[in-house]
Swiss-Prot record:
<keyword id="KW-0548">Nucleotidyltransferase</keyword>
<keyword id="KW-0819">tRNA processing</keyword>
<keyword id="KW-0820">tRNA-binding</keyword>
<comment type="subunit">
    <text>Homohexameric ring arranged as a trimer of dimers.</text>
</comment>
<feature type="binding site">
    <location>
        <position position="86"/>
    </location>
    <ligand>
        <name>phosphate</name>
    </ligand>
</feature>
<dbReference type="GO" id="GO:0008033">
    <property type="term" value="P:tRNA processing"/>
</dbReference>
<feature type="binding site">
    <location>
        <begin position="124"/>
        <end position="126"/>
    </location>
    <ligand>
        <name>phosphate</name>
    </ligand>
</feature>
<dbReference type="GO" id="GO:0006364">
    <property type="term" value="P:rRNA processing"/>
</dbReference>
<dbReference type="InterPro" id="IPR036345">
    <property type="entry name" value="ExoRNase_PH_dom2_sf"/>
</dbReference>
<dbReference type="InterPro" id="IPR015847">
    <property type="entry name" value="ExoRNase_PH_dom2"/>
</dbReference>
<comment type="similarity">
    <text>Belongs to the RNase PH family.</text>
</comment>
<dbReference type="GO" id="GO:0000175">
    <property type="term" value="F:3'-5'-RNA exonuclease activity"/>
</dbReference>
<dbReference type="InterPro" id="IPR027408">
    <property type="entry name" value="PNPase/RNase_PH_dom_sf"/>
</dbReference>
<keyword id="KW-0694">RNA-binding</keyword>
<keyword id="KW-0698">rRNA processing</keyword>
<dbReference type="Pfam" id="PF01138">
    <property type="entry name" value="RNase_PH"/>
</dbReference>
<dbReference type="GO" id="GO:0016075">
    <property type="term" value="P:rRNA catabolic process"/>
</dbReference>
C-alpha cells in the first residue's frame, strides 16, 4: 500500500494559494502533500541582449531549496559560491516549461522571472514548482493587461507537471520522498492542459523499463496532470 493509502493513479492533495506575498506581480504557495514551494513572478521591461529588437518577450526561472527544507540541513548555495548542477538543471526545466505556456511575441519586450523556493521537500519539488509557477505567471500576465501594458493576455493555456515511477514493480503517480528514494524507474512529465507533452525526464534507477511500461507511465502522468490542471483552473476562478 502507498503512503496515505493512495491508489496508484492518485496524486497527493494539491493546494494553490494565490497572492501569497504582496510585492511580486504573481505569487503562489503550491503544496503537493507535504512538499511546499513558494513561486513568485516578477516583471521587468526589456529583454536579454540576444532578443533585443525582435519584438518578443522572455521567461526565465530560478530555483532553490531552503537549508532546512530537507531532513538534514543543506548549506545555502550562495554560501558555497556557486549553484549546483541539479539546481541549474531544474531551473532550466521550469523556464522551458513555462515558455511553452505563453505566446512570446504577444508578450512583447518584457522579461518575467519565476522564482521557485522550496520551503519543504517531500518528493516532486520540480513538478510542484512548474505547477505553482504557471499560476504565478498567469496572475502576472493578467496584471500586465489590467495595467494597460498589454492589450491581450498572451497566456496560451495552463501547464502542469507530475512525477511517475515504478515502485515495487508497480507504476505509480506523484511520488513522495519514500517512494522516490526506492523507485526502480523515476520520471518527471510536463504537459499542456490539453495533454501535449512539453518534457519527459525518465531514468531507470534499477532495472531498465520496457516500452509498454513507458506508455503506462505516460498515461498515468496524463491522468494526474488533468487532475492538477483542474485544480489550477479552480484556483484561478476564485
Amino acid at each position: 500500500m502507498r503512503p496515505a493509502g493512495r491508489s496508484n493513479n492518485q496524486v497527493r492533495p494539491v493546494t494553490l494559494t494565490r497572492n501569497y506575498t504582496k510585492h511580486a506581480e504573481g505569487s503562489v504557495l503550491v503544496e503537493f502533500g507535504d512538499t511546499k514551494v513558494l513561486c513568485t513572478a516578477s516583471i521587468e521591461e526589456g529583454v536579454p541582449r540576444f532578443l533585443k529588437g525582435q519584438g518578443q518577450g522572455w521567461i526565465t526561472a530560478e530555483y532553490g531549496m531552503l537549508p532546512r527544507s530537507t531532513h538534514t540541513r543543506n548549506a545555502r548555495e550562495a554560501a558555497k559560491g556557486k549553484q549546483g548542477g541539479r539546481t541549474m538543471e531544474i531551473q532550466r526545466l521550469i523556464a522551458r516549461a513555462l515558455r511553452a505556456a505563453v505566446d512570446l511575441k504577444a508578450l512583447g519586450e518584457f522579461t518575467i522571472t519565476l522564482d521557485c523556493d522550496v520551503l519543504q521537500a517531500d518528493g516532486g519539488t520540480r513538478t510542484a514548482s512548474i505547477t505553482g509557477a504557471c499560476m504565478a505567471l498567469a496572475d502576472a500576465l493578467q496584471k500586465l493587461v489590467e495595467n494597460g501594458k498589454l492589450k491581450t493576455n498572451p497566456m496560451k493555456g495552463m501547464v502542469a507537471a507530475v512525477s511517475v515511477g515504478i515502485v515495487n514493480g508497480e507504476a505509480v503517480c506523484d511520488l513522495e520522498y519514500v517512494e522516490d528514494s526506492a523507485a526502480e524507474t523515476d520520471m518527471n512529465v510536463v504537459m499542456t492542459e490539453d495533454g501535449r507533452i512539453i518534457e519527459v525526464q525518465g531514468t531507470a534507477e534499477g532495472e531498465p523499463f520496457t516500452h509498454e511500461e513507458l506508455l503506462t507511465l505516460l498515461a498515468l502522468a496524463r491522468g494526474g496532470i488533468e487532475s492538477i490542471v483542474a485544480t489550477q483552473k479552480a484556483a484561478l476562478a476564485n
